Regions:
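Short internal beta-strands
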Residues: 85-89, 254-255
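Poly-acidic low-complexity segments
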Residues: 87-90, 116, 120, 185, ...
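Short terminal or interdomain "cap/linker" segment that borders an active site or interface and mediates
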Residues: 91-125
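Positively charged, Gly/Ser-enriched RNA/tRNA-binding surfaces
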Residues: 9-23, 29-81, 127-300
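Hydrophobic alpha-helical bundle cores within soluble ligand-binding/oligomerization subdomains
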Residues: 79, 85-87, 113
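Short, conserved phosphate-binding/catalytic loop or strand-edge motifs used
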Residues: 48-52, 88-96
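Active-site-adjacent beta-strand anchor residues
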Residues: 5-6, 87
Length: 300
């Protein structure tokens, strides 16, 4: 039997809830490997893809979310990606409002969610007055700071029910550098079906579609207890295909009679060593950019 998963996050959650259930929290785990999508899409028709990610288990506070978002951004920047956009969302926003200050019949919650995701203002109005009250959430979409002002104005009209979430969003955004574009789409649900109060997607200039996503969620333990967590997944195949993250190997030529211990140390530092077997061997011809002179590395 061959089993392939479309998402490693669930497997990491199971490990955290079983084999690592007694480990100190917050628990930080990372992973990488191939996954198989259940269905392809038009933007990415290939079904197999690489998934790289990290999870912080035991809390879904804004401090934990800030750490996760920051680590993901630094990982992309470390691979040479620029023109990064981070899109924030509040996946369970409609459920939260429908159960509180803006009541909806249970049968309406799904249709309201769908029309907000589609930004279908006319369809929302057609659902009735209760659904139409959610129209300002469509307008609270776009560049982060302007969208946040509109979301805050909407929240003021419903008695500040979202004040804690709005403060958390601002706290998460605060340490993100000005070279990163921030946007907000508070009602986006696509690919965030299991996230709770916070979610985010990554985009980069020159690439079609998202290159990663993450957010807060719950892990179910065998005893039924739910544990909060937050994490991210990156899908680096499009980046790898165009050469991001690749490093040219550092090759150093070791002449006859070289210091063997120094050569061993260089290999430990990541150098590719090419040892001479005769006086005729030529470092540059063998693809080396440096040579070992005594105990010093020297460029040709």
């Amino acid at each position: 039997m061959l089993f392939r998963s479309p998402d490693m996050t669930a497997q990491i959650g199971r490990i955290a809830a079983t084999r690592l259930a007694g480990a100190a929290r917050p628990l930080r785990l990372c992973y990488a490997g191939p996954v198989l999508k259940l269905r392809a899409d038009q933007l990415r028709p290939e079904r197999e893809q690489m998934q790289i990610g990290a999870e912080l288990i035991g809390t879904d506070s804004h401090a934990a979310a800030t750490e996760i978002v920051t680590v993901a951004i630094e990982a992309l920047q470390g691979a040479g990606v620029d023109g990064i956009t981070v899109d924030f969302t509040l996946p369970d926003l409609v459920d939260c409002l429908a159960a509180g200050p803006m009541p909806l019949d249970a049968a309406l919650v799904g249709p309201v969610r769908a029309r907000l995701v589609a930004k279908d203002a006319g369809g929302l109005v057609a659902l009735g007055d209760a659904a139409a009250a959610y129209l300002p959430l469509i307008e609270a979409t776009g560049p982060f700071h302007a969208a946040m002002e509109r979301l805050e104005a909407f929240d003021a009209g419903i008695g500040g029910a979202l004040a804690t979430r709005i403060a958390a969003l601002r706290a998460i955004a605060k340490p993100i550098g000005w070279d990163i574009t921030l946007t907000l789409d508070p009602t986006e649900r696509h690919s965030f079906e299991y996230q709770s109060w916070f979610g985010f997607s990554f985009f980069a200039s020159g690439f079609v579609g998202e290159i990663g996503r993450g957010g807060c969620y719950s892990i179910r333990h065998p005893d039924g207890r739910a544990e909060p967590a937050v994490g991210f997944s990156l899908y680096p195949d499009p980046l790898i295909d165009v050469g991001f993250g690749q490093e040219s190997p550092r090759r150093i030529f070791l002449p006859l009679g070289h210091d063997a211990e120094r050569a061993k140390a260089l290999r430990g530092e990541g150098w590719h060593t090419v040892a001479a077997l005769s006086e005729a061997d030529d470092g540059p011809a063998l693809g080396c950019s440096h040579y070992l002179g005594g105990t010093e590395t020297r460029g040709y």
